[in-house]
């Protein structure tokens, strides 16, 4: 380009006829590395691992719960042993309607 503005004479186009279909190489030329460092687990090992996870889910575990007395708002701590599913049920009860009363408020109301 000569000058501040391009002109049509300065633009050079080379057109080639493209009427024929040209073949495209679709073969992947990648090579896989050694599979020695990969560990292939048999299906029974995977199933055993899933079984262990399910067994652990059903296993009783201790959980510390901190909450407030519904009467005097004192902090309460209690420990429960429950499976994960049962703990989830207890959590739903806390969210819905379950309230705890401390020992002092429990004796005063009787």
Curated annotation (Swiss-Prot):
A molecular function GO annotation: DNA binding
Please indicate the residue ranges that the annotation assigns to the motif Nuclear export signal: 87-95
What are the annotated GO cellular component locations?
host cell cytoplasm; host cell nucleus
Q: How is it modified after translation?
A: Highly phosphorylated.
One Pfam entry for this protein is E7
Q: Which domain of life is it from?
A: Viruses
Known InterPro entries for this protein? Answer: Papilloma_E7
Q: Per the record's keyword annotation, is Cell cycle included, yes or no?
A: no
> Which Gene3D superfamilies does this UniProt record tie to the protein?
3.30.160.330
Question: Where is this chain primarily localised?
Answer: host cell
Q: Which UniProt keywords apply?
A: Activator, DNA-binding, Early protein, G1/S host cell cycle checkpoint dysregulation by virus, Host cytoplasm, Host nucleus, Host-virus interaction, Inhibition of host innate immune response by virus, Inhibition of host interferon signaling pathway by virus, Interferon antiviral system evasion, Metal-binding, Modulation of host cell cycle by virus, Oncogene, Transcription, Transcription regulation, Viral immunoevasion, Zinc, Zinc-finger
Q: Where in the cell is it found?
A: Host cytoplasm; Host nucleus
Zinc finger map (unnamed): 69-105
Entry similarity comment: Belongs to the papillomaviridae E7 protein family.
Q: Main role?
A: Plays a role in viral genome replication by driving entry of quiescent cells into the cell cycle. Stimulation of progression from G1 to S phase allows the virus to efficiently use the cellular DNA replicating machinery to achieve viral genome replication. E7 protein has both transforming and trans-activating activities. Induces the disassembly of the E2F1 transcription factor from RB1, with subsequent transcriptional activation of E2F1-regulated S-phase genes. Interferes with host histone deacetylation mediated by HDAC1 and HDAC2, leading to transcription activation.
What is this protein identified as? Answer: Protein E7
Q: What gene does this protein come from? A: E7
């Amino acid at each position: 380009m000569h000058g501040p503005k391009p002109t049509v004479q300065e633009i050079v186009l080379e057109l080639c006829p493209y009427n024929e279909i040209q073949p495209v190489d679709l073969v992947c030329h990648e090579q896989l590395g050694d599979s020695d460092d990969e560990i292939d687990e048999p299906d029974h090992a995977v199933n055993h691992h899933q079984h262990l996870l399910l067994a652990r889910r059903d296993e009783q575990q201790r959980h510390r719960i901190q909450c407030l007395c519904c009467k005097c708002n004192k902090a309460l701590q209690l420990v429960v042993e429950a499976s994960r599913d049962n703990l989830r049920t207890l959590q739903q009860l806390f969210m819905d309607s379950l309230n705890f009363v401390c020992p002092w408020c429990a004796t005063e109301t009787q």
